[in-house]
Amino acid sequence: MARYLDYVPTIIVVEPDSAACVMESIKIGKIKKIDIKRESLMGGMSCGEVSLVPWEILKNSVKYCISLPDDDIAKTMKLLGNSSFSDDKIIAGENSAPGVISLITSCEDQAIKEKLDLNEKSNVLVFGCEGDTDQEMYQKLINQN
């Protein structure tokens, strides 16, 4: 990737702590299957094994991995869907919220901010590839107290 870019971005993978297969695979340098003992609210990311095609890219480009519990998923979905947060509502599902949670948490921790070189001049791109695919579940989660 570096030969095509003047600046190589820092790539961070975020996944459920109960199914951190990318993190475990990066640690050992080969695909590691995770025995999922508890399903995550982040169902689409709770797969337990990295697919071969993305692994060929991830193994050489991921700089950091973050694994998260389900605790803040609903709160973050609600924050993003709050129209006072932005001009438009951001309808983020359970698999889109983790990247935002990681960014917020990283910005609140000075040591992590320094490690990631996060500052007021940073450009951050967070991928969120899911909206309210299950509208009933989405409403239930964002309306929790």
Locate the predicted segments by residue.
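Glycine-rich phosphate/pyrophosphate-binding loop at beta-loop-alpha junctions
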Residues: 1-60, 113-145
